[in-house]
A protein has these predicted regions:
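Juxtacatalytic substrate-recognition/specificity segment
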Residues: 1-95, 136, 140, 182-185
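Aromatic- and acidic-residue-enriched segments that line the glycan-binding/catalytic groove
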Residues: 286-290, 322-340, 412, 472-476, ...
Length: 557
């Protein structure tokens, strides 16, 4: 496939040649003339469609690396090129240590200098120790922590090899076997080095790299929301579940442009984790899933496209389950495991949000049974997130009084609420009565804003295009006829009620797909795209471009 521009391709080729020359000079020359092929794709979507792998780069065959750039990045990391050289020297292409070792040689990973990734985790006290990095672990672990740590550990093992010709190479290649052992002592025995010496070298190395990483360049840092920024005119951008229609797609780029045109100034992005249900507290991640999922690279791509249009980004990780996540139950023995998994889930997305410069992060979404158990645990989790993430924090409470019961709003910057309060108690409600119902629901949130001294952000607010939209806004009835007029009336009621409430920080409309359903007239989903509700939203957002936000004086303890 033709590279994206001759000059860029030449630059990449020179960078790859320089990398291989450095490996040659340090005793990692290929045993024979062995050309390395780097296939460059115009976009991650193209790469994913043709290879079914949407990672920015991967080892496609023992002699070929496949690369593509996330929007806004100027060059690939080229860890895959270093990995190909290691494979040529005998490393297993399937080794879990191949990518970290390649990242060490390349000096880059995740679109930034390796020392910057290490610094982010190190100063947040999240970087794994040498023993933790060597361990296979119990369950999923964030690659945003594990890959940089293992890169440094691979280098430490090399540096602790005996001072004889070829020893460092032999030590590294021993680490890169098909099935390396899952603990530091066994790894070190296999590599012929002393584990205590490796631990000491690792500790010194990551400290040095982290201090260097403080001044390394990367994406702009998150910019927290402030009341002076004005009203958040947000839209929840939902991933249409396929590569060609989701966050990585050209369709998503078009919808982001459309949202900017209709007056939005923020979008939220929602990667998911799956919880099987009662008695199964583990979380299956989409972060490093298949090409049709909300992977890290797809979220990063959508965020970069949004920022390029002047849109700010709220990262809102969700859990989903076979039942409602607000009533998850794991029993006395299962809850500690759930919280351990959820911590890994949330810290991962905090790291991603910081790396990619996303301005806001939702630390939980409609998890009522979990938030009711231990406010102190949530407060501690928010504290851990703040060590690594510098943007705005909120939690998205369900509309049915969860917000009033939350005991850790003092750890958040905004009161987040999924606003699905009913606007009617029976069919046939008038526009005036629905507006009055919206005002009553907002009044209870205003009392919470006074008690906490924090503005309220409607992290979700929306209505399906169904006849029962005003009665049960939380229910997306996938059967029956579409009723776009009922959806329009609900939006009109909410937006009219919000018009005079300057203590509300903003709202995110639920939801707008990266590839809207067609035809819109028959679509029963929450999306207002192409329906009468869209014009109501455009009118409101156009009128709120300079809308101020007032922080109410705190009246509670």
């Amino acid at each position: 496939l033709a590279p994206p521009g001759e000059r860029r391709a030449d630059d990449w080729a020179h960078a790859a040649s320089d990398l291989l020359a450095r490996m040659d000079a340090q005793g990692f020359a290929a045993p024979e003339a062995r050309p390395v092929r780097v296939t460059s794709y115009p976009s991650l979507e193209d790469k994913g469609r043709l290879t079914r792998n949407t990672r920015p780069e991967h080892v496609a065959t023992p002699r070929e690396a496949a690369v593509a750039l996330i929007v806004g990045r100027r060059s690939p990391d080229l860890w895959s090129v270093a990995a190909l050289r290691l494979v040529a020297l005998g490393a297993a292409a399937s080794s879990p240590w191949l990518e970290p070792a390649g990242a060490w040689w390349a000096g880059r990973w995740g679109g930034e200098p390796l020392e910057r990734a290490i610094a982010r985790a190190y100063f947040a006290r999240l970087l794994p120790t040498a023993r933790e990095a060597a361990s296979r672990g119990d369950g999923w672990r964030s690659p945003l922590l594990l890959v940089p740590a293992r890169a440094a550990l691979a280098r430490s093992i090399m540096e602790c090899a005996p001072a004889r010709h070829g020893a460092a190479r032999a030590a590294l290649l021993a680490l890169l076997g098909t099935a390396p052992p899952g603990d530091l002592d066994s790894l070190c025995r296999g590599a012929g080095v002393e584990a205590p010496k490796v631990e000491r070298r690792y500790a010194a190395l990551v400290d040095s790299l982290a201090r260097a990483g403080q001044s390394a360049t990367g994406a702009p840092a998150p910019r927290p929301w402030r009341p002076a920024d004005g009203f958040v005119r947000g839209v929840c951008l939902a991933h249409s579940v396929s590569l060609e229609r989701g966050y990585l797609s050209a369709s998503c780029a078009g919808e982001l442009q459309r949202l900017r045109t209709l007056g939005a100034n923020w979008v939220s992005l929602s990667p998911f984790g799956f919880v099987p249900g009662a008695g199964a507290p583990d979380i299956a991640m989409s972060a490093d899933g298949g090409p049709d999922e909300e992977t890290d690279e797809s979220v990063a791509e959508a965020a970069a496209r949004a920022r390029a249009l002047g849109l700010r980004v709220l990262l809102a990780p969700h859990l989903w389950s076979r039942g409602w996540t607000g009533s998850l139950e794991f029993g006395t023995a299962g809850w500690p495991r759930f919280f351990a998994c959820y911590r890994e889930f949330l810290i991962h997305y905090a790291l991603l949000a910081e790396r990619e410069g996303m301005d806001g992060l939702v630390i939980g979404h409609e998890l009522g049974s979990a938030t009711a158990r231990d406010p102190g645990r949530w407060r501690a989790l928010a504290g851990e997130v703040r060590r690594v993430y510098g943007g705005t924090l909120t939690y998205s409470a369900n509309w049915d009084h969860e917000a009033e019961a939350i005991g850790f709003w003092d750890s958040c910057d905004l009161i987040g609420v999924s606003f699905y309060d009913p606007l009617a108690t029976a069919p046939g409600a008038t526009q005036e009565s629905m507006t009055a119902a919206a005002r009553r629901a907002l009044a209870s949130l205003k009392a919470l804003a006074r008690r906490t001294g924090r503005p309220v952000l409607l992290t979700e607010a929306g209505y399906p295009a169904t006849p029962t939209a005003a009665l049960r806004p939380w229910e997306e009835n996938r059967r029956g006829v579409a009723d776009p007029e009922a959806q329009r009336a609900c939006y009109d009621a909410l937006l009219t009620a919000l018009d005079s409430e300057d203590w509300v920080a903003g709202l995110f409309v639920w939801k707008w797909f990266t590839a809207p359903p067609a035809p819109a007239s028959a679509d029963r989903s929450y999306s207002p795209a192409g329906k009468p509700a869209e014009s109501v939203l455009v009118r409101a957002y156009s009128g709120w471009r300079d809308r101020p936000v007032r922080v109410l004086p705190r009246s509670g303890p």
